[in-house]
Amino acid sequence: MTNARILIVEDEAITVSALKRELASLGYEVAATASTTDEALNAVELHKPDLVLMDITLAGNLNGIVGAVAIRGNYHVPVVFLTAHADDQTMERAVTAGAFGYVLKPFSGAGLKAAIETALHKHQTEIENRRAPDRAA
């Protein structure tokens, strides 16, 4: 789904710059950027992105796991985690938070695109499945 609007939540400026360049080259629009979970929640409300790319380890009081739970619960926007931590415990926490996928840092364009497209497709399928009972009634 090219042209998808993506919110980047990352507290390392160099990673934000790299993500912006890569997302643009892949045909995505960067809706906004945020560096904390609080900023991310405000940005989701304001910019209504199609997907959130969120670092698990963020500055501030709330980490990306907590942010993802709030975003999924309140806004029903898919979250794909960015992480340098591929250990089992971190991945389990990401799955429990309702993540639609994850991208390991340093990321590749192909890996980023695959994670985004998979998450968007999975999210669209969820929406269609929620509507299915309405059509049967």
How does the language model describe each region?
Residues 3, 48-50, 73-79:
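His-Asp phosphorelay/catalytic-motif detector in bacterial-type signaling
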Residues 12-32, 37:
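Two-component/phosphorelay signaling modules centered on CheY-like receiver
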Residues 42, 62-77:
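Short amphipathic alpha-helix used as the core "switch/output" element in two-component signaling
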Residues 47-58:
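Active-site beta3 strand of CheY-like receiver
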Residues 89, 107-117, 124:
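C-terminal output helix
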Residues 114, 121-137:
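CheY-like receiver
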